[in-house]
Each structure stands twice: as structure tokens, then as C-alpha cells.
Amino acid sequence: MSYTADSLKAELNARGWRLTPQREKILTIFQNLPEGEHLSAEELHHRLEEEREKISLSTVYRSVKLMSRMGILRELELAEGHKHYELQQASPHHHHHVVCVQCNRTIEFKNDSILKQSLKQCEKEGFQLIDCQLTVTTICPEAIRMGWPSTLPSNWACTRSISLA
């Protein structure tokens, strides 16, 4: 769904929440992001400060969490274990991310076979697919040229796996 201030207000009211000026401003920032750009709560807070908005970091965190739970924002786990957010798309807009663990450069890619295989596995196990995200951790060419280590930082570990065979 593409949210406007009015549709967001209706959605929030239906769930017992209010459309505060802070939430409206946060929605506006996400609506104006170029496609493929994601923001962490800290990056969002920095943008709000640049626009002279007086919104505390804790309010930003609470707002993005709420909007994520409501399906307005999509929560992504990208580089360094930080959560990033993007506006949820109306139609199935499954895409995946390649992330450099050294400089956090992120690119998006689409691969319908990943989604199809995920759906197949979910059906087999009796699960209902809600979202499909793949984050490929890499070292980008620029980081390699700069001589950054080509190993994962010690705080990185593959914590989830599923066999799609």
C-alpha cells in the first residue's frame, strides 16, 4: 500500500494509535527516499535533525518499530547487525541485498527463483510466507582495493540457515 498522511492516520486510528506530527514527518522522509535507499533509525534521526525537526532518537526508534509492525515499513537486517528500514511496497516487491561488511555499500537485486523456492519450502513444511529477504555479505571491490581485510568482522556470524533443496 502506498501511504498518504490520511491513509496512515486511518490505519493508525484503526489500531488505536494517533498520527503524530513526528510519525507524519518520518513517513514523508521514507516516501521521498530514492528507490533502493534504506535508513537506520540513527540515519533517519540525523536527517530529521538536518531538517530542524525536534524528534528524539527514542521517538524515532519507537515510530519505526510501530510502522514496521504495522507493515508500513519493511525492517531489514543489513550491515553491522543494525536494522534498516524502507517503505513497504504495495505489490510483492521482494528484493534482496548485497552488502559490503567493510564500508556498508548496499545494492539491491531481484531473483524470483529465491522467492519461488522459499514458497515451495514453506508449503512443504506448512508455513505461510510473510516476507522473503536475503542479505549476501561481501567485501566490495573498493574495499579490496583499499586493502581492507577480506574476512568477516568477529561480530558477524551466520545465525540462520535453511536448506532449500
Swiss-Prot record:
Fe cation binds at H94, H96. Residues 92-165 are annotated as: Dimerization. Keywords: Cytoplasm, DNA-binding, Iron, Metal-binding, Repressor, Transcription, Transcription regulation, Zinc. InterPro entries: FUR, Fur_C, WH-like_DNA-bd_sf, WH_DNA-bd_sf. Residues 1-91 are annotated as: DNA-binding. GO terms for cellular component: cytoplasm. It comes from the Bacteria. Its main location: cytoplasm. Gene3D superfamilies: 3.30.1490.190, Winged helix-like DNA-binding domain superfamily/Winged helix DNA-binding domain (1.10.10.10). SUPFAM superfamilies: Winged helix' DNA-binding domain. It is found in: Cytoplasm. Zn(2+) binds at H38, E86, H97, C100, C103, E108. One of its GO terms (molecular function) is DNA-binding transcription factor activity. GO terms for biological process: negative regulation of DNA-templated transcription; regulation of secondary metabolite biosynthetic process. Pfam families: FUR (PF01475). The keyword Lipoprotein does not apply. The keyword Transcription applies. Belongs to the Fur family. Homodimer. Acts as a global negative controlling element, employing Fe(2+) as a cofactor to bind the operator of the repressed genes. This is Ferric uptake regulation protein.
